[in-house]
Amino acid sequence: MVIISYDIADDKIRSRFSKMLQKHGAIRLQFSVYELRNTKRIMDNLVVRIEDFSKHFTPADSVIIFDVESSHLTKYGNAIHRDQPIVYL
C-alpha cells in the first residue's frame, strides 16, 4: 500500500492530478492525501504519470509517495474509515 500526498498550487493541474489518482484506483483520505493498493505494474504506470505531471509543477509544488505496511498504521479522527487504520505514530 502507498500513501500519496501532494501540494500543487495551480487549481487546474491539482484537479487533473486528483482525477488521475482516482482513475488509477486511489481513495481520497483527505483533500490532498490518497491511499492506493495496486499491482506493481499499475504502480509503475502511476509513477510515470506523476513524472509527466511534474513537468508542469512550479518550484513550490510537490508530490510525496510513502510506501507503507498496513500492519504499522493507526488512524484517529474522522477521516475515511477503511479496514486498516491510517495515522503514523
For each predicted feature, which ranges?
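Juxtamembrane helix-loop transition sites at the ends of transmembrane segments
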Residues: 28, 46, 51, 85-88
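Extended, hydrophobic alpha-helical segments
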Residues: 1-41
